């Protein structure tokens, strides 16, 4: 078993100059054109259906054409550095695969590749930290590309890491195992979550999940095995998927998604902040059905609250910092 966790492309955004040079100028068209072209390619590849519309540009992000040429040059470089980081990750994963092939282990190795969250919009809207001076850039500890490029990275979704809307929580997940997964050459559209990884690996290895470990009782195993997907069969999920992150939350039950910003307050969930979407028809969360599907929203909100108590989301701290004693 090998767990390979890259920090890239998390900030600070830093990369080798020879990698950056490959991408200089490639983003000079700006985020507006990039979002549109990526969306059109996603539709062409069948990743999304045309009924799932491209979300509007984030309201805090300016139009690319409104920037002065010098600022456009800076922003092109910020994205080039980010792209260079991913380029280096990609090549090093390629090295690992090459070794597996040389050792005749590639076909029998199950590879799981995923991201932990959506694009990061932390910091200034147009990025932060020095980007032109190479020495200073590589000494920065928090420089990044900003919400403007993160908005493009999340295409076609809206919002980012920290939020539980699709732009923050829906990420790529690739499983590769020539000896165990039948190639279907088509998109598999059943939802999975990170909690499904352990049940999947346990089943593949033929290992039962223990009730105790070193005399301590273990929490029940959450999630389901994804092995039905190996032959393109539907997943047998009988319970909704729940999440809470930094007071934001979601619940997905079939095609219905309950989601909200700042829902999980210290006093309990704020039902007024819940939004409701039918992901089957509206994957980009543009049509909030909270008013027209009020009863469904209430039932899902009650289910989320019950889960939050069971999984100890509550009680939450008040948020008031205690004064330190000297």
Regions found by a protein language model. Give the residues of each.
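Beta-sheet entry/capping signal
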Residues: 1-3, 107-112, 173, 239-241, ...
